[in-house]
A protein has these predicted regions:
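Non-catalytic helical tethers at domain boundaries
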Residues: 1-138
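Hydrophobic pocket-lining residues within nucleotide cofactor-binding pockets
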Residues: 141
């Protein structure tokens, strides 16, 4: 499928959703029980997942899928937001911004699957948000 005709729309909408994620994560950091914020983050991740999947950006789709899973658990009351989770979510935001930057420059998301971040998200689900997981830290340059 030739997606070039949709690329500009994808980039514009991705930037809007990334800005929403950024704004809402800042609120979530201060108000971890804010259900409106939790719902906004879920919707932004869900929208990014769908758009990435449609465009064939599987790495971006996988990361946003796991973010969506975390927020589904939070929304259902199965886990609580804590500072460790917020830190990982900011790492997700950075990774998503990198994917979008790569797509803007090369029409390709790149080769980084962000496996350590995905593992951290899944560890939160497994520990029911109790923070009993190792956080991903970026390697030093």
């Amino acid at each position: 499928m030739d997606v070039s005709q949709y690329l500009e729309i994808f980039l514009d909408e991705s930037n809007e959703h990334l800005q929403t994620l950024s704004d809402q994560l800042i609120i979530l950091e201060k108000e971890p029980d804010n259900s409106d914020t939790i719902n906004e983050i879920f919707r932004a991740a869900h929208s990014l997942k769908g758009m990435a999947g449609t465009m064939g950006y599987k790495r971006m789709q996988n990361l946003t899928h796991d973010m969506e899973n975390v927020f589904s658990e939070v929304r259902n009351g199965n886990m609580e937001v804590n500072s460790n989770l917020v830190d990982v979510l900011f790492q997700c935001l950075d990774a998503l911004e990198t994917y979008v930057d790569n797509i803007r420059e090369t029409q390709d998301e790149g080769t980084d699957d962000n496996e350590p971040i995905i593992k951290a998200l899944n560890a939160f689900i497994a520990s029911e948000g109790k923070g009993n997981c190792l956080l991903y830290t970026s390697p030093s340059p």
